[in-house]
Amino acid sequence: MEILVIDGQGGGLGRQLVAAVKKAVPQAVVTAIGTNSAATSAMLKAGADRAATGENAVVVNCRTADIIVGPIGIVIADALLGEITPAMATAVCQSSATRVLIPVNHCENYIVGVPDQPIGCLLYTSPSPRDKR
């Protein structure tokens, strides 16, 4: 199973996601794609099997992923303070992969019905990649 974790900024959420996925599904191949080198480095240190940085890396890896995990901003062009390009958002949305999106209320995007919670709490309520069937 190919699991793609996408994150930007400092990679803090991505780091937590990589660690959680590796623990929940140790046999999965986890690819970390950062919108910048800091995010990529944080996810690689958390145990990603492989990593890359930038727009083209997102576009290429969305083609082969079984599951894509990241903050909801990865499907919104110009989110994450402009780090998500329209091409990145389109690649995530058009991928045949199952998307597991973490509801983060930042950058003028608010998810109605989702209270502000610490990221750790959200990770425990996220579906496991094993739930994909």
Q: Where does each model-flagged region fall?
A:
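Short, ordered loop/turn segments at secondary-structure junctions
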Residues: 8, 35-38, 56, 74, ...
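Hydrophobic/aromatic beta-strand patches that form the interior of the parallel beta-sheet core
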Residues: 31, 52, 98-102
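Single conserved hydrophobic/aromatic residue that forms the stacking wall/gate
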Residues: 124-133
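Glycine-rich phosphate/diphosphate-binding loop of Rossmann-like nucleotide-binding domains
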Residues: 4-34
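Short glycine-rich or small-residue beta-strand-to-loop segments that form or flank ligand, phosphate
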Residues: 2-7, 68-75, 100
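Ser/Thr/Gly-rich flexible loops in soluble cytosolic domains mediating phosphotransfer, phosphorylation
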Residues: 84, 89-123
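N-terminal beta-loop-helix "entrance" segment that forms/cooperates
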Residues: 33-52
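Glycine-rich phosphate-binding loop
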Residues: 50-88
